[in-house]
Amino acid sequence: TLQALDEEYAPIFAGHSDKIYLNEKLYQRIKTIDASKLQGEDKRLLEYYKQNFEIAGANLSSADKEKLKVVNKELATLSTQYSNKLLEARKKGALIIDDVKELDGLSPDEIANAAADAKTAGYSGKYLLALQNTTQQPLLQNLKNRNTREKLFKASWNRAEKGDENDTRATLEKEARLRLQKAQLLGKKSFADWKLQDQMAKTPEAVEAIFSKL
């Protein structure tokens, strides 16, 4: 499947990226370019690549680079596993409704689509409310049956926390630990600090300040 291929190749692509950005000879070639002789786009391009190399870890010792390569491959694998688990959890978390009365408030087209989806999934005569890739489900605003709304909300909210093969909690915990390890290897106190350094906000504190004004 595409998901299996994604999991197989994600760490390979991560390793390929590291071979570029953690390449000492390539980084030194960039550093030897005299920025004072450049102008405009040429100067900005040099700054851009130099910054990208340094953010990726080009200044690390050889030993720390090797540690970072291992972490990056593990993160690539975990990130792909998380996405695949979430995709399967969304598919399997669909809500099956027996009685059309429970769909009061939905349009005729929405009800017809739910019936067709149920038939395709092997539930002829019933109705399937597929989960969307958001926490809040669009159908909630129109459904009038409180019990149906509650079931749909819980199906969405708990889709990846059922203790089955698609439960994402352990994957997220591992990813969080590795992100912290990566940030610390790169001289930052948190992954957010590392991730934001070349963004407009620059720091987690600045992001929080922006959110507080919304």
Task: Report residues per predicted region.
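His/Asp/Glu-rich acidic catalytic environments and adjacent acidic regulatory segments
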Residues: 2-197, 201-202
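Conserved glycine-bearing catalytic or ligand-binding loops at nucleotide- and phosphate-handling centers
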Residues: 73, 206-213
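Substrate-binding cleft of carbohydrate-active enzyme catalytic domains
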Residues: 171, 213-214
